[in-house]
Amino acid sequence: YSKIIFENNNMPTLLKYESISDRLIILEGWSKTYCMTGWRLGWSVWPKKIYDFANKLCVNDHSCPNSISQYAGIEALKGSQEEVIKISKEFEKRKDFIYEKLNSMERIKCFKPGGAFYAFPNISDTKMTGKKFAELALETHGVAVVPGTSFGDSVNDFIRLSYANSIENIEKAIYRLSKI
């Protein structure tokens, strides 16, 4: 998601913090930035002390993307980045829309996302856990959201919504969620 950032934010890099370099793993790929989900291309940075282990793990798990994917990835990097900028601007419009709509709901509070295409609102005022809210949203309103606990126990009263969809569909989903 490092290229899908909003409001002139710069993507910070943890590589500049030497004090954590011995336990820092960075993963990046082409999936989101270049709309190449499923092509299975990416890169990583590992600490020297676990590099050999990581290399053994990766070589047997995911080290052989096909040549078509590799050439497409090279072209994505070498080519014009105008489409990446265009897509990022579209996601920014959707972010502004979903942020405004979520915060207009009586029992939902949402911070403005700084990048990517997910909103992560706090739903604690609904008196439901994120898991219960997600189940209810899907079963009774046909809207799929992810409970916050998928990202750790400390966000039990949050949900994650994707805004990688049209404004029209986002509006329909928010309307349905407002009925919960």
Predicted segments with their positions:
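PLP-dependent class I/II
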Residues: Y1-I180
